[in-house]
Swiss-Prot record:
Pathway: Glycan biosynthesis; glycogen biosynthesis. Catalyzes the formation of the alpha-1,6-glucosidic linkages in glycogen by scission of a 1,4-alpha-linked oligosaccharide from growing alpha-1,4-glucan chains and the subsequent attachment of the oligosaccharide to the alpha-1,6 position. The active site is at residues 399, 452. GO terms for biological process: glycogen biosynthetic process. This is 1,4-alpha-glucan branching enzyme GlgB. Keywords: Carbohydrate metabolism, Glycogen biosynthesis, Glycogen metabolism, Glycosyltransferase, Transferase.
C-alpha cells in the first residue's frame, strides 16, 4: 500500500506528538481499518487477527514505522515483529482504551482526589483481557512524554504517552509487569530533552546510585495488622523511641539489617524497653545517605536500602504484633534538586516555585514546594494518606514546620518575597498544613500527627475548626534547649539558672507537647546526651539518670533517640551501628535499666500520663529552693488519689529530713529512685516508703539522694 506521511506521522517519528493515538494503532480508512506501529529495530512486522489470520505491514519509514490493513478489519489483533533472528508476538498499546475516566480527570483537575496513588504512577491491570501496566504522570508543560524501561530496552520512541485533560499523560503497556524498572523520558516546552525522571508516584525504586522506579502491585501487598486501639489517645502514655533504620544495629562488618531482620529484633527490644511507639527517620526513597532521609525523591516508596515494600510491611506488622505504634518522619517542606527528581520536572517549576527567593532553601540547598498549586497540595496530602492506609502507619511527624510557616525563614533582608498582605507568613503553606491535618483526622481518626516547630507560632496542636494548624502534638523545642542547657552546667552554677527548669511550665499546657531528645541533639558537634553531662565519671552518669527521671516526670509525651537509652558516649554516626558493646559495662546497663523502669512507671501510673497535656495534671510543690537545686511537684491523674510526688535534686549533695507537704496522710511508697544501686547509683533513699509526720498538714520527711530523682505515690 502507498502511505503518505502526514504531520502527525512526523510528529510521532520525531517524538513530539502529544497524542500518538491519533496516528498509531488502528484507524478507519475508506472501507478498511489500517494499523500503524512504530517499532524501532524491527525488520519485519505483520498483524495477526484474533482468529490467526495475518497481514503484512509495510515499512513506510526507516525509523521503524510500519503500516497496513488489519485482517478482517478487527480491532483485536497482535503485532508479530521480527528483531534479527527473533520473532515476537506483541500487543499493540495503541489499540487499548484510555486508563483515566472523565470523572477521574474532573477530580484531578479540581484537586479533590486524595487517592492519587490509585490513579497516578504505575499500576498492573487487565484491559480487554490483556495483562499489563497502566502508567499515568502529571507533566502539563511537556511536549512529549514516553515510558522507558525493561520492557522496551529504554527506547523513548517505543512507548510514547498521550496527554489527557489538565496535563495528565497516560499509556497502558501490555506485557509490562510488577518488578519492571522504568522512568519517564520527556521533551520540554521549548523542545529540549530533559533528564529522564523517576516516577513521583513510584511505589519502589532502585538502590542508589541507580534511580529507576520499579513497578509494584499494591493490591498484592500484605496489609499489616492494626496497632492496639487508642494507642495515640491524648490520655494514653506515649513514649517514642526514635530510630534510624540504617544505624540502629548492623551485621557482618557494618552491613545494614534488612526490614525483615529489623522485624525480628527491633519490636521486641522496643517492647522490652517499655516504649509505646517507634518513630522512624524518613523511610521514603532518598539518593543521599547523609541526608538521613530528609531529602526524599520517592515519597511513596519505602527505601530499597533495606528491602522491598513487602519487607517493610513485615516490619510494621511485627511492631503492631508487639503492641508498638509506628510513626514516620514525613518531609513535605522541601526536596532535593537531583536531576531524576521533582525539580524542573516537565521543563518548568512544576512542584517548586520558579523564583529562587521562594523556591530554594538556603540552608539545605533544596527546593521548596509551591503550596499555591492545587496539584502539589493534592500530591502531598495523598502521600500522607497513602502511608496511613497502605502501610497502616499510626502517625506522621512533620519535619521543619517552621521553615514552611515563614517566608523569611533563614533568609537575609531583601532575600524573600512577602505574602499578598505584606507579611512574612506563608499563607499557602498554612492552608496546606490545615488541610493535611483535617484530611488525616477525618479519614484516620485513630492516627496522630506531630509538628517539629521551633517558633512561638500559636495553636499548632489545636483543631483546624478552632483556628489551629490541626496537629495532634508539637515538639517542645524550648523545653529541650532550656533543660539541656541547665543540665550541662556544673551543679555549683545551676542555682543561677534555676529559671530554665521553671520557665517551661509557664507554657507547658499551651500546646499538646512532646518532649524531644531527638537525633538533632546528638550530631554536629553537640555531643551525645551523656557527653553533655558535667563532672567526674560518677557525676556524669548520675546527672544523666536524674535528667531522664526529670523528663519522664515532666508533663508531656516523651521521645528519645536510639542509643540515648543506654548512654551512648559518642555522637550518632549514620554510617555506624550503635555501640551496643557498652552494655557489657554496668554503668551503661544501669542507664538502660533506669529508662526501662521509667517507661514502665510512666505507663503504669495514670498520674504520669493521663493529664500530660492538661494543667490540672500538674502542681508545683517546691520552686524556690535554688540554693540546693531542688524541685518538687505533684503529677495527677483523673482519679482523686491518682497522684505521684516527684522530687529532683540537681546537686551532688544528700539532703536529710527534707520536708515536703503532701495532700494525703499515711504511707507513701517510693516507686522509683534514680540513685538506686541497680542503676549505678549510691543507693541513698527512703527504704522504699515513708509515712507522713504528725501534724495538721500532711508532710513527709525525706532523704533526698544526690543528683537524683525520687517518685512517691500514696498507698491506698
Amino acid at each position: 500500500m502507498t502511505v503518505q506521511l502526514t504531520d502527525d506521522a512526523y510528529a510521532v517519528l520525531e517524538g513530539r506528538h502529544a497524542d500518538p493515538f491519533r496516528y498509531l494503532g488502528p484507524h478507519p480508512e475508506d472501507d478498511r481499518v489500517v494499523v500503524r506501529a512504530l517499532l524501532p529495530d524491527a525488520t519485519a512486522v505483520e498483524a495477526v487477527g484474533e482468529h490467526g489470520e495475518t497481514a503484512i505491514l509495510e515499512r513506510v519509514h526507516d525509523a521503524g514505522l510500519f503500516a497496513g490493513p488489519l485482517p478482517n478489519g478487527s480491532h483485536r489483533y497482535q503485532l508479530r515483529a521480527r528483531f534479527g533472528d527473533t520473532t515476537v508476538d506483541l500487543e499493540d498499546p495503541y489499540r487499548f482504551p484510555p486508563i483515566l475516566t472523565e470523572f477521574d480527570l474532573y477530580l484531578l483537575g479540581e484537586g479533590t482526589d486524595q487517592r492519587l496513588y490509585d490513579k497516578l504512577g504505575a499500576h498492573p491491570m487487565v484491559l480487554e483481557g490483556v495483562r499489563g501496566v497502566g502508567f499515568v504522570v502529571l507533566a502539563p508543560n511537556a511536549r512529549r512524554v514516553s515510558v522507558v524501561g525493561d520492557f522496551n530496552f529504554w527506547n523513548p520512541r517505543r512507548h510514547q504517552m498521550r496527554v489527557r485533560g489538565n496535563g495528565y499523560w497516560e499509556l497502558f503497556i501490555p506485557g509490562a509487569t510488577a518488578g519492571d524498572h522504568y522512568k519517564f523520558d520527556m521533551t520540554g516546552p521549548n523542545g529540549e530533552t530533559l533528564p529522564q525522571k523517576s516516577d513521583p508516584m513510584a511505589f519502589a525504586a532502585e538502590m542508589r546510585p541507580k534511580t529507576a522506579s520499579i513497578v509494584v502491585d499494591q493490591t498484592r501487598l500484605p496489609l499489616p495488622r492494626p496497632a492496639p486501639d487508642n494507642i495515640n489517645a491524648l490520655g494514653a502514655p506515649m513514649s517514642i523511641y526514635e530510630v534510624h533504620l540504617g544505624s540502629w544495629r548492623r551485621k557482618d562488618g557494618e552491613q545494614w539489617l534488612t526490614y525483615r531482620e529489623l522485624a525480628e529484633q527491633l519490636p521486641a527490644y522496643v517492647r522490652d524497653m517499655g516504649f509505646t511507639h517507634v518513630e522512624f527517620l524518613p523511610v521514603s526513597e532518598h539518593p543521599f545517605d547523609g541526608s538521613w532521609g530528609y531529602q526524599p525523591t520517592g515519597l511513596f516508596a519505602p527505601t530499597s536500602r533495606f528491602g522491598t515494600p513487602e519487607d517493610f510491611c513485615a516490619l510494621i506488622d511485627a511492631c503492631h504484633e508487639h503492641g508498638i505504634g509506628v510513626l514516620l518522619d514525613w518531609v513535605p517542606g522541601h526536596f532535593p534538586d537531583d536531576p531524576h527528581g521533582l525539580g524542573n520536572f516537565d521543563g518548568t517549576a512544576l512542584y517548586e516555585h520558579a523564583n529562587p527567593l521562594q523556591g530554594r532553601h538556603l540552608d539545605w540547598g533544596t527546593l521548596i514546594y509551591n503550596y499555591g498549586r492545587t496539584e502539589v497540595v493534592n500530591f502531598l496530602v495523598s502521600n500522607a494518606l497513602f502511608w496511613l492506609e497502605r502501610y497502616r502507619i499510626d502517625g506522621l511527624r512533620v519535619d521543619a514546620v517552621a521553615s514552611m510557616l515563614y517566608l523569611d525563614y533563614s533568609r537575609p533582608a531583601g532575600g524573600w518575597i512577602p505574602n499578598k498582605f505584606g507579611g512574612r507568613e506563608n499563607i499557602e503553606a498554612i492552608d496546606f498544613l490545615r488541610r493535611f491535618n483535617a484530611e488525616v483526622y477525618a479519614k484516620f481518626p485513630q492516627a496522630t500527627t506531630a509538628a517539629e516547630e521551633s517558633t512561638a507560632w500559636p495553636q499548632v496542636s489545636r483543631p483546624v475548626e478552632f483556628g489551629g494548624l490541626g496537629f495532634g502534638y508539637k515538639w517542645n523545642m524550648g523545653w529541650m534547649h532550656d533543660t539541656l542547657n541547665y543540665i550541662s552546667k556544673d551543679p555549683i552554677h545551676r542555682k543561677y539558672h534555676h529559671g530554665q527548669i521553671l520557665f517551661g511550665l509557664h507554657y507547658a499546657f499551651s500546646e499538646n507537647f512532646i518532649l524531644p531528645l531527638s537525633h538533632d541533639e546528638v550530631v554536629h558537634g553537640k555531643r551525645s546526651i551523656l557527653g553533655r553531662m558535667p563532672g567526674d565519671e560518677w557525676q556524669r552518669f548520675a546527672n544523666l539518670r536524674a535528667y531522664y527521671a526529670f523528663m519522664f516526670a515532666h508533663p508531656g509525651k516523651k521521645l528519645m533517640f536510639m542509643g540515648s537509652e543506654f548512654g551512648q558516649e559518642r555522637e550518632w554516626n549514620h554510617d555506624r551501628s550503635l555501640d551496643w558493646h557498652l552494655l557489657d559495662t554496668p554503668k551503661y546497663a544501669g542507664i538502660q535499666a533506669l529508662v526501662r523502669d521509667l517507661n514502665r512507671l510512666y505507663r503504669d501510673l495514670p498520674a504520669l500520663h493521663q493529664l500530660d497535656c492538661d494543667p490540672f495534671g500538674f502542681e508545683w510543690i517546691i520552686t524556690e529552693d535554688a540554693a540546693r537545686n531542688v524541685f518538687a511537684w505533684m503529677r495527677k491523674g483523673n482519679d482523686t488519689r491518682a497522684r505521684c510526688l516527684v522530687i529532683v535534686n540537681f546537686s551532688p549533695n544528700v539532703y536529710q529530713d527534707y520536708r515536703v507537704r503532701v495532700p494525703f496522710p499515711g504511707r507513701w511508697r517510693e516507686v522509683l529512685n534514680s540513685d538506686a544501686a541497680i542503676y549505678g547509683g549510691s543507693n541513698v533513699g527512703n527504704a522504699g516508703e515513708v509515712r507522713t509526720l504528725e501534724g495538721l498538714v500532711p508532710e513527709l520527711s525525706l532523704n533526698i539522694p544526690p543528683l537524683a530523682a525520687i517518685f512517691l505515690k500514696p498507698e491506698d
